[in-house]
Structure formats: structure tokens, C-alpha cells
Amino acid sequence: MSTADDFRRIFAYNEKVLQSFSNALSRLSWETLSKNMEASHNSMKNIFIHILTVYNGWINYNALGKSDSIPWEQHDPKNYNSMNQIVEFMLSAMKGVTRFMDELNDPKLSKKITAPWMEEEHELSDVLMQVTLEQAHHLGEIIALLWQLNIEPPQMTWIDNT
């Protein structure tokens, strides 16, 4: 089983990679970023926002027992009209995540977490893995979309980013 220190290391990697992708996406035109490319959430913009909402919803709200306070308007891609707005949301969400990770300890990993969109409770350790894997597979999707545009994606290998 992973420890709080393991998760802090993983989340430091996650944040570094997320920032690299934010920088890469910021170099694209808004038209390219928001174009429907028939992906899971249609556009790279929407996919990236989805990753941020996973962090924000699971860690900044559900894990803190504040599921009723999730700011759904922040989670709606239609409310974003520039990459600057998305970066502001990312910085805000990740500030909460960093604070959460700083306070994480091993006993908290077994805490039961509920989410309004799921029927069952899940241990915090599983929630943290879900957030990590969600980022990985959606960034993989963005990588494929960048390749379709002949754009080299940011480096995201664990070894190069830790």
C-alpha cells in the first residue's frame, strides 16, 4: 500500500506535468484549443478542464466532506473563453491540492470518501489513485491530439519529471 509520502511524490510529478501541458496548450490558438476533435470531451480545452475538475471535485471538495459546495460553474467548459481563465482555475485548484497534500498523513489514506455522482464510498488512497490515473489517460488523449496536429507534446515520463 502507498504511503502519504508516496502520494506527495506522485502528486508533485502530476502537478509538474500538468503545468507543462498548460504551457504547451497556452501556445496554441484558441480556435485550435477549443476545436471539436471528436475526443472524450471533444476539444483539448474541454479535456484539460475535465482534468482540473477531477482534482477540484475529488480533492478540494469531496475529500474534505464538502460535496454540497462543489462550484459546478467552474467545472463547465462553456464558462472559459481563454487559456488565461483556464490557468487561473488550474492555479486555484492546485493551490488547494497542495495544501491538502501537505496535510496528508498515512491514517487519512483509509478515510472513506463519497461523491455525489457515485453510490459507494471509496478510500482516500483509491481517490488519489483515481485522480492520478484520470490525469494520465486524459493527457494521453491530448498527446494523441497534438500528434494529429504535428505538434510534439511535453515530456511526461516519470523518470524525466521526478
Residue ranges and their predicted role:
Residues D102-W117:
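Acidic catalytic patch
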Residues F7-N23, R27-H75, A115-T162:
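Short, contiguous alpha-helical
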Residues G65-L104:
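Helix-adjacent hinge/juxtasegments
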Residues M1-D5:
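Basic/polar N-terminal segments that are highly enriched at the extreme N-terminus
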Residues W30-K35, N79-S92, K108-L109, L124-Q130:
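Short alpha-helical interface patches
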Residues D6, G57-W58, Q85, G96:
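Exposed alpha-helical structural elements
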